[in-house]
Each structure stands twice: as C-alpha cells, then as structure tokens.
C-alpha cells in the first residue's frame, strides 16, 4: 500500500475525517490468571554495611515457584519451620540474568502481542529493589547490539522488528511514553512542553463510554477496557509511512543508493515544508504552535476502535526500527523524575507506562490492532527510612497513596468484590483493563533479601500472591480497514501542513541550532556522496564491459566443465560395471568353494564305506574257506573210513598213500589259502595306505584353497567398499554440488536487478540532478560489477578446489580397482597351482590302486583252480598212480574209489567256483570300482566348460593350453568323477 500526494489532495473533508468501521473481532477465550513472578536481588552496599542478614530463601540459579521468608529471629531448622512460604508462577534468584527473565516472562506475552492480543507487564515492589533495572536496564547499545544488562523494553523493541521483518507483512508501529507524577500525567516524549502551552497540552484521562468527546465515530463499547494512550498529530515522515504501509521493491544490494535517496527525500521534504513535527530520528526540535481549539476529535486516534479509557493530548510517534524506539525510550528516561534518597541513589519518583501499538496486516485490506503496555511502577518507601523531606516527602506520599489504591484494587479483584475502586487513583484507571480486563498481564514483584526490609518484602509478596488470583479474559484486538488507516494518516499530515503554513505566514519557521547544524551537515554529506557516486558510476561502466568479457569466458569454461562432467559420468558407469563384475566373480568363488567342500565330505564317506566293505569281505572269505575245507575233510574221512572198513588195505599200502595224499592236499589248500589271504591283505593295506594320504593331500589343498578364497574375499570386499564409497561421494558431488549454482544466470539477474534498482532510485532525483544522476548510476554499476566479478572468481575457485578433492578420491578409487584385479589374478594363479597338485595326487593314487588291483588279478590268473594245482602236483600224481596200480586187484572197490575221488574233486571245484565268485564280487563291486567308470563324451564335454577361476572365466580347455601338465583332453577318472559331483551339486 502506497500513500501518494494525489490521494491526499483528492480526498474530501469527509474522507479526511476519521471514521471507525464496525469491524471489531472479539474472540472470547477462557479466563486466565495473571502471571506473577518474583525477582529477588542480592544485598546492596547499604545492606552489607548495615550487616543485615538474608531472610529470603530463593534459588541462586534456575527458576522455581516458591519463595520463603523468615519473619522471626530464629536460625537453623527453627527458622525454616517458622518461615512463611509464598507460591507464585516464577521465582528468580540473584543470579538470574536479564535474558532469563525476558525469556520466561516477556517472551510468551510478546508472542501473544504479535498474534493480536493486548498485553501488559508491570513491575511492582519496594524502592531500590530493581524495578527500573528489570524493565529498562542498560538501554544503550554496545557495538550496535544490546548488552547483557538490557531490560524488557529494549529487548521487546528489537525482537518486534526482527519478527515483523522476518514475516514480511505490512505493519505500522507507534510508541508513547507517559509519566504519572504526583497524580499528574506528563508526556515524556513531548519536547514542546513549555510554560506557555502547558495548559493546552495538559494530559487528561477520558472514558469513551461516558464522555461524549469521543468524536471518532466509535460506538459505546463498555465491554472493552483499553488503557492505551490516544494518538497525537503524527510526526513521522510520509516516506516512512509509504515504506511501512506499502510493499516496496528496494533490495539490500542498493544500500548506498537507498541511503542517498532517503537522505535526499528528507532534505527535499524539509526544504518544501520548512520543518518536520517531532522528528525523533534526527533529534530535531521544531516549534509548532498548537491550535487546539475545536480540534479535540483530531487528536484522538481514529483507529483506536475499542478504547474505553484514553489519554487526551498524548502523542504517539511512528517508528520504523528498533533504534528509533530506543531513542524515544532514552529521550523519555531523561525527562523522567529521578531523585537520590538514602535507600537509592537513582530512585524513580513517578510511575511510567511505555506503550507500543502495532497495526499488522491480517487479511489483505484488514489490519489488526494490538498494544503492549510496559509499566514501571515507582517503589513504595518508608519516609523515615528513606530520609525524604519536603518535596521528596510529598512525592513519597503520592507514590504510596497510588500504590495503596492499587493494593485495594488487587484485594477487591482477588476477593471478587462487587465494587472495584479503579477511579480512586489515576494509576488504577490506567491499569483498569490490565487488572481483570481483556488483556494478558504479567506482574513482576521485586524484593530485597535483607532482614532490614523484611516488612516491605512481606507486603510485596502478599500483594503478589493475591494478584495471582486475579483472572483476565483476553480478547484479540480490533480490526481496521487499510483505507481507514490511510485516511487517518492523511488527516494527521494535513493538520501538520496547516500548522506549518500558519507558522510560515507569521514569523517563519523556528529551527534550533542543533537542527540547523544537522541539516547543514546532511547537505555536505549529500554533496560528498554525489561526487563519490559520479566516480563510482564511471568505474562501474568500465567494469561492465569487463564483466561482459568475463561472462563470455565463463561460458567457454562452463562448456569445458560440462564436457569434463560427461567424461566423468562415463568413467563412473565403467567403474560401476566393473564393480558388478567383481561382485559376480566373488559369488562364483564362494559357490566353487562350497562345492569343493561338499566333494571332500563325499570322498570321506566313500572311504568309510570302503573300509566297511573290506572288513565284511575278509570275514566272508575266511568263513567260506573254513566251511568248505571242513566239508572236504569230513567227506574224505568218511570215504577213507569206509574203504578201511570194507577192505584190507595194509597189504597194498593204500592207507599210507592216502595219508600222504591227504597231507599233500591239505598242504596245497593251505598254500592257496595263504596266498589268497596274502594277496588280499597286501591289496587292502595298499588301499588303506594310499587312500588316507590321498585325502589328506586333497584336504590340505582344499584348506589352502579355502584360506585363499577367504583372504581374497576380504580384500575384494574391503576394496569394493572403498570404491563404492568413493563412487557414491563422487556421484553425490556431481549431482548436487558441481556447478549447480547457475553462475551465469545469477550474474545476469544480479546485474539487471542492480541496474533496474539504480534507475528506479535515480528516477526520483532526475528533477534536479539529471546529469549527475547518470554518472552516479554508472559509478555505482561499476562498483557493483567489480564486487560481482570478485564474488564470481571466488565461487569458481571454490568449486574447482572442492572438485579437486573429489577428483583425487576418484583417482584413488581407480587404484583400488586395479589392486582388486591384481588380488584376483594372484588368487587365480594360486588356485590353479593347487588344483594341479590335487590332480597329480589323485592321479598318483589312482595309478597305485590300479597297480595293486592288477597285481591281484595277475595272481588270481596264475592260480587257475585247485584242480589244476592238484593235477600239477607230482607227489599227488605219483601217489594216485601207485594207488591205481595197487588197486588193480581191488576191482570190487574200484568204482567206489573212483566215485570217492570224483566227489572230492567236485568239492574242490565247488571251492574253486566259490572263490571265483567272491573274487568277481570283490573286483566288480560298483562302490569299490568307481575309478573304472567311464564318462560319456557329452558329459565330459559339458564338464570341460565348467568355469575354472572367476577373474577371466577360463574353462578347462583354455586352462589345458596354458599349463603343460593338463594337455590331456580326457581327464583321469577320479578328476572326472570330482567334476561330475561338482556339476551335480551346482548344475548352473
């Protein structure tokens, strides 16, 4: 919203007359108790010199809600038992800082004030207890900032404008400062309060619902009890009003131009209107006659819609910054009544109310009005103790009287009496809405811990505890239309112009020497700044051309950087694919290791089965041979006995021959049995000897392979983790940070905005400074481009420096990948050598076992049968021949003997057949002759394609070409069997 001169002149007198619209929004809320806090200071020098003991028990640090006072002379436990305890909302000890008090008490009320509620903070207590220190404190700035001792009022001012600027809402802020001294009101900000016009400017309290002087058009609102002061003629500049009521587009980059523009605007307005009314920012002292007749309505604020109690002739000052408000506070404090007493060197002799009125944009054309009253009450004092005399005694009596009335009001409100004596004192009338009204109120009671002031301390705590029971019903402030606010400001400006014109027509404008010096100093400053602006514009023009060249250079650099980024992205994609391949290889290694371990377990099971079969075979052979030999012996004995019983063989010596025959047969059978047992024993021993050695070697090689695989896996995992981390960092940096600042657009946008802003600011100076303005713009532009160029170089250097670190990390990740490949290659070579050794051991064991089996087979073939052995025995043949010769005479028994021999031969043949069956069973057992299994060509071809090593994925055929030891395409049976087992366990 912008207030223009045309709008002011086009308004009719009816529009200039303030009219209040019925747009008051009162939101009823629940009743709230007054927030009561107690602040206890430490003992001062007077109390320490008087050796007054501490009788108040409060925490030195932190915040509690209880305070105890010892009203007796007891000490120790008795003192604690007889102490009187008061409960309030907050209790602050001597070490509590000003910041802590503000955050705990004033900060919540300040937030409500911003939301639109009327708020009041009162400081109450005995003299010299720190009321003014709590409310005002150190109001001076130190290095442009508030000190630690700053009180509530300075902190509220600074936080108010910080909050409003952060919210970026339209707003208007006014301040007033009133003093109640000896039951008389005084405007502490009125610099024209002289003896000649003191009667005209006398402040009076009015009640709008009973006094007909409320000419602002507001209806009687008896339910609203607002004690805020009324508006006086506005003394702020029209430029300030336009800045706060309207949205302006000035930026922080054109600070020099804005300062020049503001200073020149103030100078121009001063030269045209000759003066300003109460210009608090520049400490000007303009004397304007007060034509107050028939103007009572104009001095009342037309925007204070809900006020029921107001102060006539109290001036409100527009402020646009916390510094301006702080200057008003300091100005009022200088005029406040202060005196020295025996209890306090700087004792406030009056009550003061500093009021901040906020008009804040709510919804478009509506502004909400809220007030914050910061009340510093004078301290009650004992006249005999303070040494007050004459005028000081009168002041003390007036202070005590007003505080006594305040105490009665607090008691009446706490007891919920029907009659509340607000009108018995001007102080209570001003605080009427703060006590039991529609505001949010906080009371800070200040006390002394010394025993010499225990009575006053008890009285203060009694009032504080009773005030805690007072309930207020806070309501949001009223709404006001924006055009009504503009009409009010227009009316005030019109009155100021009228007063200035009347003053000019009489005797000119009176201006103080200080004001004149300020104006003269401002003019000299303007001239100096104009000269500097000329030089700045010239330099800015030259640097503009340089900046254009830099811009083209930056475009080329940007293209190069984009190409580098594309190349880096390709490298990142390559690295990512390499990482995936390494992960796949690692997975294959793990799978192969599991398969080898499974094959090892299966071979161990086969060994156990072989040992079991060997024991079973030995037992079976031993049992069978023993049974058959027993049967043969029994048969031969039976036939021999039969022959002996049926013939006389002594003469023919058949019995001797038979005995020798029997012995020779038994000898041959035992020799055959021993030879078979020896052959099978040697075979078994050889197999038992070779098999553990074979599997021990295989197990050792497998352990080596497992260890190598684990080491390789850990190295690869660590390396891949580092590579992945560096890759993610590089990717995040390239995505989020690398040249994402749009430097070209920022530079172009910044230059255009700066140039447009300079032109806009210069438009208002074109009337008198056309030629100088062009040079001023060029010089400012040169300075701005110079600064922008420096910032651009710094940004680019920072980007390149940050990218250098990322690039170094990326190169490090490439080295890690190369290291990973080297580790994989070493593992592949070690794995190949171990597999070759395993194959050699398996082949050697296979050859040994095959030789043993061949030896057994050759021995078996050499021993064709028992019959051939018997027939080849000369002794047996001779004995049989002799028997035949001797038995020629025994014709009757020839056939029987032949049958007996035939039966014996059949039994021997049966033994021979059974031995052959057993040998065939041993030699043809599928579980003991797996080494002879043949693998089909298709299966062998498929086994040859199984990956050996995962780095280069070489198959068996490729590996045979590399290692001479594996030139054979057909692998040994045991290796084929191992590969088949691995294939069955992992068919993919």
From Swiss-Prot:
SUPFAM superfamilies: P-loop containing nucleoside triphosphate hydrolases (SSF52540)
Keywords: ATP-binding, Cell cycle, Cell division, Coiled coil, Cytoplasm, Cytoskeleton, Microtubule, Mitosis, Motor protein, Nucleotide-binding
Main location per the UniProt record: cytoplasm
The keyword Cytoplasm is annotated on this UniProt entry: yes
GO MF: ATP binding; microtubule binding; minus-end-directed microtubule motor activity; plus-end-directed microtubule motor activity
Keyword Nucleotide-binding attributed: yes
PROSITE patterns given in the database record: KINESIN_MOTOR_1, KINESIN_MOTOR_2
Similarity section: Belongs to the TRAFAC class myosin-kinesin ATPase superfamily. Kinesin family. BimC subfamily.
Biological process, per Gene Ontology: cell division; initial mitotic spindle pole body separation; meiotic sister chromatid segregation; microtubule depolymerization; microtubule-based movement; mitotic spindle elongation (spindle phase three); regulation of mitotic sister chromatid segregation
Compositionally biased intervals (Basic and acidic residues): 965-974
Recorded GO CC terms: astral microtubule; kinetochore; kinetochore microtubule; mitotic spindle; nucleus
SMART domains, A to Z: KISc (SM00129)
Function: Elongates the mitotic spindle by interacting with spindle microtubules to generate an outward force pushing spindle poles apart. Following spindle assembly, CIN8 and KIP1 apparently act to oppose a force, possibly generated by KAR3, that draws separated poles back together.
Chain positions covered by the region annotation Disordered: 206-301, 965-988
Entries under InterPro entries matching the protein: KIF11-like, Kinesin_motor_CS, Kinesin_motor_dom, Kinesin_motor_dom_sf, P-loop_NTPase
Protein name from the UniProt record: Kinesin-like protein CIN8
């Amino acid at each position: 919203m912008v207030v223009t001169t045309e709008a002011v002149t086009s308004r009719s007198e009816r529009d200039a007359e303030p009219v209040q619209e019925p747009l008051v929004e009162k939101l009823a809320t629940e009743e709230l108790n007054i927030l009561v806090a107690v602040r206890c200071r430490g003992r001062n020098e007077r109390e320490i010199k008087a050796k007054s003991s501490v009788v108040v028990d409060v925490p030195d640090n932190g915040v509690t809600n209880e305070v105890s006072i010892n009203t007796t002379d007891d000490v120790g436990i008795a003192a604690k038992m007889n102490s009187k305890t008061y409960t309030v909302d907050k209790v602050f000890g001597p070490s509590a800082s000003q910041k802590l008090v503000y955050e705990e008490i004033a900060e919540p009320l300040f937030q409500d004030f911003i939301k639109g509620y009327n708020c009041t903070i009162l400081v109450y207590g005995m003299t010299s207890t720190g009321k003014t220190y709590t409310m005002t404190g150190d109001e001076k700035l130190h290095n442009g900032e508030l000190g630690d001792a700053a009180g509530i009022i300075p902190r509220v001012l600074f936080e108010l404008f910080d909050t409003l600027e952060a919210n970026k809402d339209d707003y208007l802020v006014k301040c007033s400062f009133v003093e109640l001294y000896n039951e008389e009101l005084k405007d502490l900000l009125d610099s024209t309060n002289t003896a000649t016009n003191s009667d005209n400017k006398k402040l009076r309290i009015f009640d709008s619902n009973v006094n007909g002087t409320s000419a602002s058009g507001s209806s009687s609102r008896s339910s609203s009890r607002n004690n805020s002061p009324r508006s006086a003629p506005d003394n702020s500049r029209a430029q300030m009003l336009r800045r706060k009521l309207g949205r302006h587009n000035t930026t922080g980059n054109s600070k020099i131009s804005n300062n020049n523009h503001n200073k020149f605007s103030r100078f121009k307005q001063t030269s045209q209107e000759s003066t300003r009314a109460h210009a608090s920012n520049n400490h000007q002292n303009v004397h304007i006659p007060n034509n107050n007749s028939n103007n009572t309505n104009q001095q009342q604020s037309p925007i204070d819609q809900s006020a029921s109690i107001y102060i006539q002739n109290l001036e409100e000052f527009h402020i646009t910054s916390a510094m301006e408000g702080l200057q008003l506070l300091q100005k009022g404090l200088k005029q406040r009544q202060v005196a020295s007493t025996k209890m306090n060197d700087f004792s406030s002799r009056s009550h003061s109310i500093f009021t901040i009125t906020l008009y804040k944009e709510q919804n478009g054309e509506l502004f909400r009005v809220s007030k914050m009253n910061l009340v510093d009450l004078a301290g009650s004092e004992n006249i005999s103790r303070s040494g007050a005399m004459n005028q000081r005694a009168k002041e003390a009596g007036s202070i005590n009287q007003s505080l006594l009335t305040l105490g009665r009001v607090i008691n009446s409100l706490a007891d919920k009496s029907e009659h509340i004596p607000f009108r018995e004192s001007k102080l209570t009338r001003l605080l009427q809405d703060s006590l039991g009204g529609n505001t949010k109120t906080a009371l800070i009671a200040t006390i002394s811990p010394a025993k010499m002031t225990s009575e006053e301390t008890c009285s203060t705590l009694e009032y504080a505890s009773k005030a805690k029971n007072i309930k207020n019903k806070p309501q949001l402030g009223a709404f006001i239309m924006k055009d009504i606010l503009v009409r009010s400001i227009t009316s005030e400006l019109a009155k100021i112009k009228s007063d200035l014109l009347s003053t000019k027509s009489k005797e000119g404008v009176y201006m103080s020497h200080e004001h004149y010096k300020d104006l003269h100093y401002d003019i000299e400053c303007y001239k100096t700044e104009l000269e500097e602006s000329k030089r700045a514009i010239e330099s800015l023009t030259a640097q503009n051309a340089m900046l254009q060249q830099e811009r083209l250079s930056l475009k080329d650099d940007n293209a190069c950087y984009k190409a580098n980024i594309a190349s880096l992205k390709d490298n990142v994609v390559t690295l990512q694919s390499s990482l995936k391949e390494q992960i796949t290889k690692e997975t294959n290694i793990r799978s192969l290791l599991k398969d080898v371990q499974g094959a090892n377990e299966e071979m161990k099971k086969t060994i156990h089965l072989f040992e079991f079969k060997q024991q079973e075979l030995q037992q079976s052979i031993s049992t069978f041979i023993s049974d058959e030999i027993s049967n043969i012996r029994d048969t031969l004995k039976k036939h021999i006995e039969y022959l002996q019983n049926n013939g006389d063989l002594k003469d023919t010596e058949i019995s001797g021959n038979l005995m020798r025959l029997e012995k020779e047969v038994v000898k041959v059978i035992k020799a055959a049995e021993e030879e078979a047992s020896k052959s099978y024993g040697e075979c078994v021993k050889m197999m038992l000897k070779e098999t553990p050695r074979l599997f021990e070697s295989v197990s050792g090689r497998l352990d080596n392979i497992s260890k190598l695989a684990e080491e390789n896996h850990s190295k690869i995992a660590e390396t891949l983790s580092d590579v992945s981390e560096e890759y993610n960092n590089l990717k995040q940096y390239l995505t989020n940070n690398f040249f994402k600042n749009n430097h070209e657009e920022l530079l172009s946008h910044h230059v255009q905005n700066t140039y447009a802003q300079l032109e806009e600011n210069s438009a208002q100076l074109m009337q008198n400074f056309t030629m100088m303005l062009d040079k001023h713009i060029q010089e400012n532009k040169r300075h701005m481009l110079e600064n922008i160029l420096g910032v651009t170089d710094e940004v680019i250097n920072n980007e390149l420096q940050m990218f250098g670190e990322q690039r170094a990390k990326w190169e490090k990740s490439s080295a890690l990948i190369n290291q990973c490949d080297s580790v994989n290659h070493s593992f592949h070579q070690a794995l190949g050598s171990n597999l070759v050794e395993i194959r050699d051991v398996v082949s050697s064991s296979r050859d040994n076992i095959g030789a043993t089996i061949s030896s057994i087979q050759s021995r078996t073939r050499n021993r064709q049968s028992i019959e051939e052995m018997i027939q080849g025995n000369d002794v047996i043949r001779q004995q049989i021949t002799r028997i035949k010769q001797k038995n020629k005479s025994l014709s009757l028994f020839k056939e029987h003997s032949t049958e007996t021999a035939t039966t014996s031969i059949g039994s021997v043949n049966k033994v021979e057949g059974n031995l052959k069956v057993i040998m065939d069973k041993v030699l043809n057992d599928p579980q003991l002759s797996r080494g002879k299994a043949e693998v089909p060509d298709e299966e062998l071809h498929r086994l040859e394609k199984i990956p050996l090593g995962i780095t280069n994925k070489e198959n068996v055929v490729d590996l045979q070409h590399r290692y001479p030891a594996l030139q054979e395409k057909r692998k040994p049976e045991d290796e084929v069997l191992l590969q088949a087992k691995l294939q069955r366990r992992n068919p993919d």
